[in-house]
Amino acid sequence: MIDPACGTGGFLLSSYEHMKGQSHEIAKQKFLKNNTFFGADNTSLVVTMASMNLYLHDIGVDNSPIVCQDSLIDKSDRMFDVILANPPFGTRPQGSVDVSSNRPEFEKTSDNQVNFLQHIMSIVKTGGRVGIVLPDSVLTDTGATARVRRKLLDEYNLHTILKLPTGIFYAQGVKTNVLFFEKGTPTKEIWTYDYRTGIKHTLVQNPLKRSNLDEFVKLYNESTRKETYSKDNPNGRWRKYPIDEINKDESLNLSFKWIAEEDDDDKTIGEYLTEMETISADLASSVAKLKDLLEGVYDD
């Protein structure tokens, strides 16, 4: 498995902790530590920290599995069975190598998350599994982003979306999701768990805990999935969207909403501030995209 934007290696270590108890055979433990986990980051200091982090857990002792590289311009033909990633938010840093010139098969966009999604789609093996953290914009934007979504639905099985509260992975106010998909068969239906509407977490007073997602994990792992949403229970958080219904929307908007929002009169000042931060984050993202477009015009 690989994390192509691994940072200090948190996803890799969590995966190791999850897997290490599955077998006590010495050969399998050795393979797990030396031949299972790989990561990449484009900052040398971060790569060093990730390597040390794994080394302290006896992973990659002889040869670090973390490389310093820009994953978005990596043309190696290595494929992976499992990919976990939380790509950096926003646009590429100024001075970075142009992605489209190195990856002409990609839909041309300056959106970092969309490019990482395209990269991950290109390196997962047939039958391989992906879990990737992405902002709402990747589920809603038109143009190149919508075309990437079209390819994702046509060539991969995007079976599950977990909607998270704002501020969990990115800055406060940015709405995030975890997309789960497999390569090899087209999407027939998308199961969505809304752990956002009416849910509020803060880093200090009410941090997100593993137990908060117990219901999602249980529903996700059921051999026969059943919706908790129904006409009699319109606020059920687990809902299925068939591909025929999704295709009726020409924009392929995948940010599904069905749970009623609370009335404004019930909101606290802190919640209003969070909404303002959300609007500010969306505005900053739009301004960044506009700057990219204007730079392209001036370059021409």
What are these regions (language model features)?
Residues 1-85, 90-92, 100-102, 110, ...:
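Conserved S-adenosyl-L-methionine
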Residues 74-300:
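A conserved structural/catalytic subdomain of Rossmann-like adenosyl-cofactor enzymes
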